Structures are given as C-alpha cells and as structure tokens.
Amino acid sequence: LVGSEMCIRDRDVLERMDEQMYYEYRAIMAMFKEAVEAMIQFQDAETGMFWQVIDKVGVPGNYLETSGSSLFAYAVLKGVRLGYLPKRFRAYGEKAFYGTCDKYLGVNDKGELQLSGICLVAGLGGATRRDGSLEYYFSEPVVENDAKGVAPLLLAYTEMIIQ
C-alpha cells in the first residue's frame, strides 16, 4: 500500500531532521499531514483498514490488507505522539489497528497466534507481469504470518501502549 509507505517515510525523515533544516522540515511535515489526510478518505468505514488497491473498493479480488493498514496505523499513532499530527488523528490510527486485529488476528488449529490478510509481495517493473494492473495486484498470494504484516502490526501495537 503505497500511501502507507509514504506516511512512514515522511514520519521517519521528520524524526531525524534538526532545526537547521527548518524549511525542509516544514515542507516534509506538510507532506506527511497531506499524505495522512489523503489516506483517511480511503479508510474502510467498517473496519478502519485499507483495501489492497485503495480506490477499488468492492472490485472482485480486492481485499482488506494487513501490512498497509498496519503501516498506516503505526505512522499515524507515532506522528500524533511526536506532535507531527493533531491529536484527533489518533482515532484513525486506532481504528486501523483494532480493525486489523479484529479481522485478521486469531489463533490457528495448533493454538498459535496467526495474522492473515498479508500480501506476499507486490511491486512494479522487473518481471513482465508486474505491470500495475488490477489483475496483477489481485493475483499476488495472500499469506499468513509474513514479516511484512507482523512487524508493522507490532510497531503499531508499540505505539498503542506507549501513548
């Protein structure tokens, strides 16, 4: 989910900038807030998650995706904690976090925690089939317990408990 990755990037850059880069800091701060505000309009009203292709809600093959939703939750929650976003934005991060847990976090037949709804891989270029089409994005495997989904959820959880 590209929008979530942009939110993380902007928030990470802001955290490392010093006062000597005031104008650059202000520009990236504005981009971060703009990216979050743009993403909010695509947040699923029921679950708080984001669809694999965010502007194609309900298209057959599209699904609520764990890694992007968790990245968004993490970026927003940390952005609020560090003062980069207004406190009212915390509700959007919490909704994405809880929605992901409610929909995809459970216990498997062996009694182990299981996180599902994770896109195994998606990208553009390289192999000829990575053409950016809906068919391509919807054809990528959806997996369980992959680090690309588990790690962002744990990062978001960390922000949930330290605020």
State the predicted function of each range:
Residues 1-8:
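Short, small-residue-biased leader/transition segments that mark boundaries at the very start
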Residues 4, 24-28, 43, 52-70, ...:
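Solvent-exposed loop and edge beta-strand segments that line ligand/cofactor-binding
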Residues 5, 31-34, 71, 92, ...:
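Charged catalytic carboxylate motif
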Residues 8-16, 74-81, 155-162:
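Short glycine/serine- and small hydrophobic-enriched flexible loop segments
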Residues 13-26, 79-88:
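Inter-helical turn/loop segments and adjacent helix faces that build the functional surface
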Residues 28-47, 92-110:
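Long, well-ordered core segments of solenoidal/helical folds
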Residues 41-52, 126-130:
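Acidic-glycine-rich active-site phosphate/pyrophosphate-binding loop
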Residues 64, 80-163:
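CBM-like carbohydrate-recognition segments
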